[in-house]
Design a protein with these regions (language model features):
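Mature, soluble, non-transmembrane domains
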Residues: 21-24, 43-50, 55-56, 76, ...
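N-terminal secretory signal peptides
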Residues: 29-74, 79
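N-terminal trafficking/processing presequences and adjacent post-cleavage segments
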Residues: 9-13, 101-102
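Signature of exported/secreted
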Residues: 66, 86-87, 91
Length: 181
């Protein structure tokens, strides 16, 4: 009886932990970055907070992978991730941060050339719609991200991304002050 009770408790704990595990944001198996700047400023507008937050995001191409870093405006890193073979892994001792992975994956979607989006996010799980100044990704028939390009693609580094799961909007612009590290 005690053994049965103990194994039942373990089973419940495992189910609870599995429920807490978050779904990774969509990333392509093969990375097709188009005109990706290495450094951008991202203003995060969260409907649940009063003030927007500004981050610096740095992307570094490494042999077969992309290294993603996010810093506050004082230069302190708060997230470091490596994307290799369609999988995220930690870079250094920073803890995993699902919210930041969502931002990084959304940026990767925005920086994928339109001709490569169908290959990068194949059906039936994903549905990609590309309009002149708006790109939409649906995952399992649900809106995931909408990218809206400011001034169309004439200025490909000015855009915003709406994360439909959280309601957060990220406004992206090139880093204009190289002194911010």
């Amino acid at each position: 009886m005690m053994l049965y009770l103990r194994s039942s408790v373990y089973a419940v704990l495992l189910l609870a932990l599995a429920g807490c595990a978050s779904h990774s944001p969509p990333v392509p198996k093969e990375v097709f970055i188009w005109q990706a700047p290495r450094q951008v400023l991202v203003t995060e507008i969260n409907p649940k907070t009063i003030e927007p937050v500004v981050w610096q995001v740095v992307v570094q191409q490494q042999a077969g992978s992309l290294r993603w870093l996010r810093f506050n405006l004082l230069g302190a890193p708060d997230a470091r991730q490596i994307l290799a073979n369609g999988k995220w892994r930690n870079d250094g001792f920073m803890p995993p941060n699902q919210k930041v992975r969502e931002l990084f994956a959304a940026l990767l979607f925005a920086w994928t050339h339109p001709r490569d989006l169908i290959l990068a996010y194949p059906s039936p799980q994903y549905d990609v719609n590309v309009f002149m100044d708006k790109w939409v990704l649906k995952e399992n028939s649900r809106l995931r991200w909408t990218v809206i390009w400011q001034n169309g693609l004439s200025q490909p580094n000015l855009f915003s991304i709406k994360d439909h799961k959280s309601g957060i909007i990220w406004q992206v612009r090139p880093l204009t002050n190289p002194d911010i590290k």
